[in-house]
Amino acid sequence: MKLNQFGAAIGLLATGALLSGCGSDNNAAVGSARTGPSSGQVSCGGKPTLKASGSTAQANAMTRFVNAFERSCPGQTLNYTANGSGAGVSEFNGNQTDFGGSDSPLSRKEYAAAEQRCGSQAWNLPVVFGPIAITYNVNGLSSLNLDGPTTAKIFNGSIASWNDPAIQALNTGVALPAEPIHVVFRNDESGTTDNFQRYLDVASNGEWGKGIGKTFKGGVGEGAKGNDGTSAAVKSTEGSITYNEWSFASARKLNTAKIATSADPEPIAISVDSVGKTISGATIIGEGNDLVLDTVSFYKPAQPGSYPIVLATYEIVCSKYPDAQVGRAVKAFLQSTIGGGQNGLGDNGYVPIPDSFKSRLSTAANAIA
C-alpha cells in the first residue's frame, strides 16, 4: 500500500454541486435505494496495483479503503495521491490515473473530457461523506457560534475583528478579544473550497457575494495547500480561522465552531448524528448510475439538529474502461470500499454510507466493466 499527499507518504489523513454532466428530471431520494447486488460481495482480479489521485478530504478514509481492498483481494492494492480535487480530475481525464477523487462532481466541460478519456460514460460515485469544519485558534476561546451570514462576512473580509458586534451577538456572554481575524484559505484547486463557497452562497442571505468554484474567491487572508496545510496553519497562528475537512480538524485537535441554521437557531456542533440528519435528506440528480447528489438542502437544512456544511467525495470512474483489467480492479476496489471499508469511518471524522444508499451504490459499482 502506498498513500501519498503532495508526493510524500502520509499517515493521518468526505457536495454537493448543482451541475452535472448528466442531469435527470427524475430525482430520487438517497434513501430510495434500488435493488442491487449485495455490498458485501467483492469480485477480485484485474490490475494488481491501481493508481488514483485527488481529494485531500478523503485521504484519511482512503487509508481504511486501501486496507479493506488488500484484505479482500490479496495481491491487489491502490496507490493514492492526495493532491486536491482539481488535480484528481485533470489526472484522470489525462489518463494518468485509473480513477479520480473529487469533492465536486464533474462539470460539463470535465465530463466531456472524461467521456473522451473513457470511450464511455463517466460516473460520479459518492463513497465518502464528511462535514467541513470551521476551525479557529483564538487564545482562551474554546467555544464559538457562527451562522451563514456572519461566516460569509468573515471570509470576504467584511468582518475583520474577533469582537465584531455580529460575532458577539451569536456568542452572548463570551469575552471576545479585540484582535484581527487572520483568514486561512486553500490556495490549490479544491472541492472543499467549492463546497464551502457554495454553503456561503446559499446560506448567507446575500452577504457572501463572491461566487463559487474550486478556487477561493474571498479576496482576503493567506493561502495554504490542502486540508493538511490549512489545518497546520491554523494550529500555529493565533487569531486565525479556516475551513477543513473534519478528520483533519480532529487529528490536529482544533477548535471547531457550532453553526446556527434557518431550521434551528440553536448552534449545531459537528457529530456523526448531526451530519447523518443532513445527508438523509439528499436527493440524486444524476442519471442512471451517475450518482450526483443535489446538496443545496445540506446548506439550508429543514430538519433541526442538522449540521449544514457537508460534502460528498466522488470517485470519478469510467463505466467501461478501455482496459478491462483496470475496470475489473476498480470494481473490486469499490465493492470492498462500500463493504468492509466503511467500518470505523466515524473514528476518522466521516459518516459511513447510509444503509439505504448502499444498494444503489453497489448497483453502480457492479456495473463497471
Curated annotation (Swiss-Prot):
It is found in: Cell membrane. The keyword Membrane applies. It comes from the Bacteria. One of its GO terms (molecular function) is phosphate ion binding. A lipid is attached at C22 (S-diacylglycerol cysteine). Phosphate binds at S55, T56, A57, S85, D103, S190, G191, T192. One of its GO terms (cellular component) is ATP-binding cassette (ABC) transporter complex. It holds the Pfam family PBP_like_2. A lipid is attached at C22 (N-palmitoyl cysteine). It is a lipid-anchor. GO terms for biological process: phosphate ion transmembrane transport. Residues 1-21 form the signal peptide. Keywords: Cell membrane, Lipoprotein, Membrane, Palmitate, Phosphate transport, Signal, Transport. NCBIfam families: 3a0107s03. Belongs to the PstS family. The complex is composed of two ATP-binding proteins (PstB), two transmembrane proteins (PstC and PstA) and a solute-binding protein (PstS). Part of the ABC transporter complex PstSACB involved in phosphate import. This is Phosphate-binding protein PstS 3.
